[in-house]
Amino acid sequence: MGSSHCDLGDRTERLGGNPLNRCKLARIFALMPKAIPLLDAGRFLQGDDAARTAFAQDLRDAFSRYGFVTLEGHGLDADLIQQTYQSAASFFGLPVEQKMASQIPGVGGNFGYTPFGQEHAKDEARADLKEFYHFAQTHYTQPDCAAVPEFTKGGQKLYADLEALAIELLKAVAMGLDLPEDHFTEQVKGGNSILRVLHYPPAPDAPADAPRAGSHEDINLITLLVGSSADGLEVLDMDGDWIPVRAHSQHLTVNVGDMLQNFTGGVLRSTTHRVVLPEGEGRSKSRFSLPFFLHPQGSMPLDPVMGDREAHPCWTAEAFLNHRLKEIGLS
């Protein structure tokens, strides 16, 4: 074994390791499964100045290395989340013609219902194996679902809660980047954010490599993913390995989108991820997911303010969004 495999530096010292045992520790670390970092959001949401600063730095480190983080202590209403999943199952169980009554033409899928097989990942010819419903800002005309009224009511409440939390997390992002804490706040209030209620139907006969959601990066600033109903999400790390993100009802997964990556000149990473079909009996079960995509107002400039400015073009958020919607078949 080459010496590079044994060089763990100060990390092993902090773990109480003796330099003579570094090679043994290196072998142990190599065998441990990779995982997305888990942070306690309560340190920022309820902590003192020192705790908030430390959390902001930890968040920056995670976003720079992985582009993803898992949070506990986020304060979201677990009962509301469970009720939203239950009403989503009722909505997606409706006949197609009833669901199509909630589709709104000409809005690029930004709100309302989008049917199965319409969206695909960038540069992917095959459609994703999913259907979804978007909740948007209340000033848009949101279609009511008369057959499942609790779906509309619960979705709108969860949207508001996730938007408020996302704005707080962007304050931590700003602090970690040495920007004023409220740098993003006014630019995301009333923005084009959406709560996507996703249904991946059973696919027992789909090809082994068929994507529930093909490899892609998110368009927006940050995404908040409420614990999914089943595993399947995988994140591509810097070593080229796919890391599974385990579904946990009490955890929130947060990731960097392309807009934030562009704004930071690549300092924060928008990481490729996908949703894969399970093996065996899992293919015969539905999977539900609740990602919240935090978008700014369309006028927000995404010109890079740090990092590799030459590699990241100057856009407004609106121009960037419209460009990407065309790439994935929603415009």
Regions of interest found by a model, annotated:
Residues S3-S4:
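Serine residues within intrinsically disordered or low-complexity segments
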Residues L8, P19-R22:
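Short hydrophobic targeting helices and cationic amphipathic motifs
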Residues N21-S331:
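Peripheral, non-catalytic segments flanking oxidoreductase cores
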Residues D7-E13, A26, A30:
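Acidic, Ala/Val/Gly-enriched low-complexity intrinsically disordered segments
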